[in-house]
Amino acid sequence: MALPVLSEGAISAILGGDSSCKPTLQVINIRSINTGNGPPRYRLLMSDGLNTLSSFMLATQLNFLVDNNLLATNCICQVSRFIVNNLKDGRRVIIVMEMEVLKSADLVKGKIGNPHPYNDGQGPPQPAAPAPASAPPPSKPQNISAPPPPSMNRGASKLFGGGSVVNTPGGSQSKVVPIASLNPYQSKWTVRARVTNKGQIRTWSNSRGEGKLFSIEMVDESGEIRATAFNEQADKFFSLIEVNKVYYFSKGTLKIANKQYTSVKNDYEMTFNSETSVIPCDDSADVPMVQFEFVPIGELESKNKDTVLDIIGICKNAEEVTKVTIRSNNREVSKRNINLMDSSGKVVSTTLWGEDADKFDGSRQPVVAIKGARLSDFGGRSLSVLSSSTVMINPDIPEAFKLRAWFDSEGQVVEGTSISESRGGTGGGNTNWKSLLEVKTENLGHGEKADYFTSVATIVYLRKENCLYQACPSQDCNKKVIDQQNGLFRCEKCDKEFPNYKYRLILSANIADFGENQWITCFQESAESILGQNATYLGELKEKNEQAYDEVFQNANFRSYTFRIRVKLETYNDESRIKATAMDVKPVDHKEYSRRLIMNIRKMAAQGV
């Protein structure tokens, strides 16, 4: 089979300013360049059959071609998109953004023709170069095709190839370049990009002083990058920059990116300095929105802990907002756990924080896309939103439309399999629904570790005897105190005496559903949810009005709840029995419960039960 014909003269045409060609070239050599903490960069010596040039640089998103031996010495490829980058010393680098291997190296015997090194900057381009290189003779149909009509490349030409020039403060001019071409060796550059994420101003104080900062993430057609403004620049730019707006960014400092806490796909990150300018851009229709690289939920189990990644899923259900205190700064923040499911039927527990947690509404089961969530192994596999993450509800992207269509047509009756909890794991999301009969017939709790399940059941009996006790009043201690009979109460754990105490609840309850019953132990929060009163009030009621105290327990009987239960086989005095503990008690979501019953009926009907 004939080899593809090389685009003779293409190198000369590219360096002469032809940005529309799609030349067919041969790889003569590949050299890896160490970039420190970032991924390797590959420098290519390429031939067009007439000349060779060693100034081709492979974009990092194409590294897989070399890593998988698809791109190797002697192979023939077509470069469909590239960027010419001018360095400070006058040299030019051609960054290959898109390419296709047309003929693998093992099918090409060696170097084609007798090409000579191209002398960049030494006189005019060689006359042998045809123009344009991308328009081969009709007799060679295997060669590269003609460039597309200009209208098809309007956005790219407008951004980069068209050579847009921006006036920066001070009267200087700077040419707009793509984000993908930025590197620390450039001095003058401008990018036109959309801000996709903006963090709040954060402050710090240490032995070296104090300061403030905020970070943004921006994207253009070629890629994305993270930028940070410190101190004076933070004050200068914070109110100016808005999410989803497009700006011209000029003259920042570029350095190797720290990828520990961000999923931005760029080897470098930007820092604003005293010369940085940010100018709003009104003509922004062709600048893309957030760029995602979604990882299917089913693949999370094979990813490393602490990986920062993008995820999309339908919100199956959402827990209520809770308040937690961050130990490092003693600051109280909002927290909400939601469960996301994709078309694989896999479910992952995801934690939202702060404003994202407060404002989230999962009642209509929205599509949730998160850019930059961190993966943990707490309770199987779970995700947590970072301060640098972007959370989008029902985003206007094809993946969201596809997921919504799947869920509305068939996904809403899929129960889902959680990867955030496994048999023997910790209590994960609100999944693993079981009837009480299934819990016993499946011998849940008989393994080496505890099992967790969720069930809808009804209170049939509450054991009110000894359900209240007097506990240590210290905030972090719930140990029972001993009445010293002198007006003081002693806590053996704290080794202190107190003039007061607090009431705590340990309530034994018998619950039942349509097929079985189960004794469970309910501690403070769960017991208060069932009784509808807090422990302090119940303690006072028991001391002052025994009849009213009894009525609280009577009124709590025969009420139904959704129980989250931990079961484990435990041994006391050589006798083994299942201990069931209520981890959470919530009112029944009858809409969700009815949906699940309908789903089960359909499953049974399909199985002919």
From Swiss-Prot:
Residue ranges of DNA binding: 189-273
Stretches the record annotates as Disordered: 112-164
Recorded GO MF terms: damaged DNA binding; single-stranded DNA binding; zinc ion binding
Gene that this polypeptide is encoded by: rpa1
Sequence similarity: Belongs to the replication factor A protein 1 family.
Name of protein: Replication protein A 70 kDa DNA-binding subunit
Cell division as UniProt keyword: no
Biased composition (Pro residues): 124-151
A Pfam family this chain is assigned to: tRNA_anti-codon
Keywords: DNA damage, DNA recombination, DNA repair, DNA replication, DNA-binding, Metal-binding, Nucleus, Zinc, Zinc-finger
A Gene Ontology term for the protein's cellular component: nucleus
CDD domains assigned: RPA1_DBD_A, RPA1_DBD_B, RPA1_DBD_C, RPA1N
Self-association state and partner proteins as the record states: Component of the heterotrimeric canonical replication protein A complex (RPA). Interacts with rpain-a.
